[in-house]
Amino acid sequence: MATVLIIGASRGIGLEFVRQYVAEGNRVIATHRTPESGAALRELGAKPIVLDMLDEGAVLEFGEKMANEKIDIAVINAGVAGPRGQAVTSPGGLDFDAVMHTNVRAPMQLIPVLAPALIASRGKLAVVSSRMGSLSLMTNTASWLYRVSKAALNAALRTASLEYGPQGVVCIAFHPGWVRTDMGGGSADIDVKTSVEGMRRILALANDSSNGKFINYNGEQLSW
């Protein structure tokens, strides 16, 4: 039985990660932002923990809670889309802060505090990023603030792989596909079950050679 930590588990991809890992008999710790959103996680059999990723003190306190854990798999899934559209326009300060703090700053705060628990088990760390964050695959201007945030998240994950890979932690950035969630919309390509099954399959097979890679849910390696 593995110990699995899902950050941002109240709905969508995060909730499906919880559902599938619990169904396999794993011990799952799942974070959510508000007390009300923990009920569904508890019913699934996970251990819910309230965590506001934008609260630096809360992140440090959470790290203390994890200090005695051995985490086999940690998935940082929390994220926001921000303004949509094709136009390259100046982002407002509130939009910029909301997207960059949630998608970049929060994971950068979390990764170092989770590292000891991952190192202890030679575990695996994944961030749910997006193909839209790839510089080499960029072909349009849609959602440019979101793109920038995911490019920064990719850089953070790649940097973490250089720090923690030599200590036995496999670090991966995922493109989950275009998924039918609140963020992806109803016309997206795949359902959340298919996306998470693919990412879980990759995590199960991941080894030292997977460290620092950017991988599609279907196993395709993506360029940064």
Segments from the language model and where they lie:
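N-terminal Rossmann NAD(P)H-binding glycine-rich loop of SDR-like oxidoreductase domains
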Residues: S10-V22
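Conserved glycine-rich Rossmann-like NAD(P)H-binding loop of the short-chain dehydrogenase/reductase
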Residues: Y21-A39
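Catalytic loop of short-chain dehydrogenase/reductase
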Residues: V80, R84-M100, M108-Q109, I119-G165
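C-terminal helical subdomain
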Residues: P166, A173-P176, G185-W224
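Rossmann-fold cofactor-recognition segment
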Residues: E43-G57
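Conserved Rossmann-fold cofactor-binding substructure of NAD(P)-dependent oxidoreductases
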Residues: M53-E69
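Structural signature of the Rossmann-like NAD(P)-dependent dehydrogenase/reductase core
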Residues: I6-I7, I76-N77, K124-S130, V170-H175
